[in-house]
Amino acid sequence: MTVLEYVAMLAALVLVPWLAARRLAEPVDGSDPRAAFEAARARHARRALLRRADASALPVLTTSRRPARTVACVVPLREIVGSVDRGPHPFDRRFDPSADTAWARFAAVLRARNDGVELPPVLLHQGCDGYYVLDGHHRVAVARALGDTETRAEVAVDPSPCA
């Protein structure tokens, strides 16, 4: 193996994944809803290729209990880890859109944010390993795509979330 071949192999093994990982962390520009949606979809596809696994699975919390009250708070987006069992969602575990079915609502939420509309807080359920979305999947997706670090939320209070 020549030095040039060795350097090329090293670049493919180290540099390319490093550059891809940096690109995965970049927030999208919110001025064009279609471009923002496509950038988030592309980020989902790159992440799936890098992991060589199905990155489309959004963790689901199965619960039959519906807490009676909620508490208003600000929640770090990194602590939102999945969805409460309400059917399939067109997002991966980082809330990047994994299907075109998310486009219309994603665009509507992004336009509302760009127009200065105050969106309602997301409704979350606290589990043992983080928060699960009851309502507001598209708001979480747009917030993450734009690089926000936290979001306003109503957290469903459960006296024993890990029981």
Describe the function of each predicted region.
Residues G147-E150, V155:
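Contiguous mid-protein beta-loop-alpha structural module that forms a pocket-lining wall or clamp
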